[in-house]
Amino acid sequence: GPDIGGPVGPYVQSERMGMFKQYAEQLVAEGKAYYCFCTEERLEALHAEQRANGEMTHYDGCCRDLPEEEVRQRLAAGEPYVIRQKIPKEGVTGFDDVVYGHIEVENSEMDDQILIKTDGMPTYNFANVVDDHLMGITHVIRGSEYLSSTPKYNLLYQAFGWKIPTYIHCPPVMKDAQNKLSKRNGDASYQDLVAKGYLSEAVMNYICLLGWSPKGEYAEQEIFSLEELIKIWSPDGISKSPAIFDPLKLRAINAEYIRRLSPEEFQKKAEPWIDQAVHTPIDKKLLCANLQPRCEVLGEIPEQLDFFDAMPDYDVSLYTNKKQKTTPETAREALEALLPLLSDESLDFSDRDTVFNACKAKAEELGKKNGWLLYPLGIALSGKQRTPGGGTDLACMMGRETTLARVKAAIEKLNG
């Protein structure tokens, strides 16, 4: 590759430019290509006339059969030129594709494509064929939009007497029914998705399922390790129809990958995102234990944690919850009942279960359900309805000092 070199370098296109013209001139010498001296003005006029007549624009072969002497004179005079491939005028050119099968095109429908431009640079198609041959490429895997140009590729391989590679044309990935995914239009790339907090393995898994489906015993399976994909992937499963990129499906697969991480793996991946939002001491292990079952995309973690560093302003109407049978009035009562319990130095905040059981016992003592007591605690500690964990979880993440300060502030707010 370009970074480490190798036996078929150079691997940077600009460093290979000198080799293409000699291959084009070889085809000219063998009568399989020719010099074309047509000016831009002539070609523009030709195409305008063809369009006016309702024809597809194409080169008319004006320079295809120029006498050799005239060609030599014009070259000697320094006249600008391109080198064009001499496409047969009759017959058909066919090729076999692993996905689309055997395809044939009438030679009369193909243009004498340019191989070398006036500046001496090769065209994309010509450079591709020469590079692939010299680098020993055996399989050409590319988008189905290149199906139409493949016959010209094959004619070049045949002209040189080179072995034709195996073609695998893949359907495009669409943004919707009409538009292809395009970086130019702001659609996310692999790197963008990883930067947003999608797991690399999940993105790879999802992308593999775009336009491809497993067979046999794996037909209903959606989650695959890289090792499994390497083992079972086959071009037989590639669809001819375009695939539509479904961000919700990617999200679901990513969430499943997150759930399958060990607690230690999840914390390692989540910590950089946690550190973006939280700069005060918290129990990260407990936080991650609560985040992991709820997390779908790592990049969405910071917005869930914005209350740890500073308590946001909130409306006391948040304490109203029909399911938990709470109101601002009952919330004040609940928090006042919790305050002595949470102030007890013997209560170990490093043990979440101990704190929860103590709160549960207090609820039973009051003749109330757990939610009646703990829902207000969660609001008092976060100022939010949705948080990564319940009231006792948040208390243990924050520690006794912060918990007591926020509970006291909440009681004061409710009294105000």
What are these regions (language model features)?
Residues 353-415:
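Charged substrate- and nucleic-acid-binding regions of tRNA-handling and nucleotidyl-transfer enzymes
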Residues 193-201, 240-246, 278-287, 364-372:
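Structural motif
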Residues 206-207, 233, 254, 288-295, ...:
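Short alpha-helical scaffolding segments that buttress acidic/His motifs in well-ordered protein cores
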Residues 1-7:
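A glycine-rich helix N-cap at a beta->alpha junction
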Residues 28, 32-35, 47-50, 54, ...:
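A generic secondary-structure signal for well-formed alpha-helical elements
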Residues 263-366:
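Small-residue-rich helix-loop
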Residues 13, 26-169, 175-181, 189:
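Active-site cores that bind ATP or allylic diphosphates and position pyrophosphate for catalysis
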Residues 10-14, 37, 116-117, 135-146, ...:
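Conserved phosphate-binding loops in nucleotide/dinucleotide-binding enzymes
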